Amino acid sequence: MSKATKRKHVVKEVLEDYVTPTEDQQIMRVLGSNGNNLHEAVTGSGERFLLSMPTKFRKNIWIKRGDFVIVDPIKEGGKVKGEISFILYRDHIQHLRKLGVWPEGFQEDRTSGERNEGTQKERSEEKEEEEGDSESEDDDSDLFVNTNRATVLYSESEEETDEDEEEDKGRA
């Protein structure tokens, strides 16, 4: 199987499959990446663990701080105590909440997240209104300037063109 085909199947599996954790598995929130495909995560009860990312997800699926994952425990692990088996996105989280499988420790984060989303929407609406006012003015000062190109100023004056025309007429 080529890399592109493998990536396609892994992404399709992560986005389309709805998985519920088994008795051994648990849902955890990623706190950050420690490098070498190790991620620090916390359970709903507040316990912190190091998790390893399996090779099928490496360079195919990205995990950032605050994402939720389903973890298979590693019983013989010293520092690394779990392996990520599934990455949860918004639709998966809503599905797990409907089933009543979502951990109680993460329930409170939902309400604070919704509050933050509401304030962010209000701020974005205010910014759009401010931008709407500035759009009526033709101000190009906020445009990106490419510093990798030399700035060339072209100045054409009518005097030069008149002189050129007179010289051309004199030659003819």
Curated annotation (Swiss-Prot):
Cellular localisation: Nucleus
Keyword Nucleus among UniProt keywords: yes
Pfam family, one: eIF-1a
Keywords: Nucleus, RNA-binding
Superkingdom, taxonomy of origin: Eukaryota
PROSITE patterns given in the database record: S1_IF1_TYPE (PS50832)
Gene3D superfamilies in the cross-refs: Nucleic acid-binding proteins
Main localization (coarse): nucleus
Region listing for Disordered, in residue ranges: 107-172
Role this protein plays: May play a role into cellular response to oxidative stress. May decrease cell proliferation.
Stored PANTHER family: RNA-BINDING PROTEIN EIF1AD-RELATED (PTHR21641:SF0), TRANSLATION INITIATION FACTOR-RELATED (PTHR21641)
Similarity comment: Belongs to the EIF1AD family.
UniProt name for this protein: Probable RNA-binding protein EIF1AD
